[in-house]
Design a protein with these regions (language model features):
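Charged, amphipathic alpha-helical segments and their flanking helix caps
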Residues: 1-26, 47-188
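Short N-terminal edge-element motif at the start of the domain
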Residues: 24-35
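Short amphipathic alpha-helical patches
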Residues: 33-40, 118-123
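A solvent-exposed acidic/polar surface segment
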Residues: 34, 42, 90-94
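A short, hydrophobic beta-strand-centered structural micro-motif
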Residues: 36-51
Length: 188
């Protein structure tokens, strides 16, 4: 899942964070000793859930992409975390306005982003980390399959030869294996 457009949108639409949005690598590399300016947030992929193939004679599958926005706020002045949770609650509306019901481009390939919930990840005497979870759907269709690769490799359908074998209802009730007619169809 490509989260770069989401990070860019958050940087543009959330002025309180002063563009302090980064990705999974920066979150993974964050240490206790490293104290980024806060508030800061990290956008990380969480999971992809696939539905069953929704077509009986083609291919259409919905993929639910879930990502987290891990928000870091300062907890230095309040070891009980009440100030940090109040700060977090004041930042949520800004994040929601930046993401909820937004369609990434191209719009026909992405559903709108929805909120899935949140949880506290960590809290120490310096900072509080809370993860807000969001999701959007993408879609797989025939163009994403190997069958399409095979179909693309076939020559153009130019015509067909047809043999007609009449059913003999009085004798066997089946075709006798000897064609009674033949015709050719050409497409030009």
């Amino acid at each position: 899942m490509n989260l770069t457009p989401i990070i860019n949108a958050l940087r543009k639409r959330c002025p309180t964070f002063e563009r302090r949005f980064a990705g999974a690598a920066e979150w993974a590399g964050l240490t206790i000793e490293h104290a980024p300016a806060m508030p800061a947030a990290y956008v990380v992929p969480l999971r992809e859930d696939a539905s069953e193939n929704e077509s009986q004679n083609c291919y259409y599958q919905t993929i639910t992409n879930t990502f987290g926005v891990i928000v870091l706020v300062s907890n230095a002045a309040d070891v009980r975390g009440q100030g940090a949770t109040a700060t977090l609650d004041s930042l949520k509306p800004e994040l929601f306005r930046a993401l909820l019901l937004w369609h990434q481009e191209p719009k026909d390939e992405y559903s709108e982003i929805v909120y899935e919930g949140g949880s506290l990840l960590d809290m120490d005497d310096a900072r509080l980390a809370s993860q807000l979870e969001f999701s959007f759907e993408t879609y797989l269709d025939l163009s994403d399959t190997y069958q399409q690769v095979e179909l693309d490799g076939l020559p153009e359908f130019e015509g067909m030869d047809v043999d007609v074998d009449q059913i003999e209802p009085s004798a066997t009730g089946r075709p006798d294996g000897r064609p009674e007619a033949h015709f050719k169809v050409e497409f030009k």
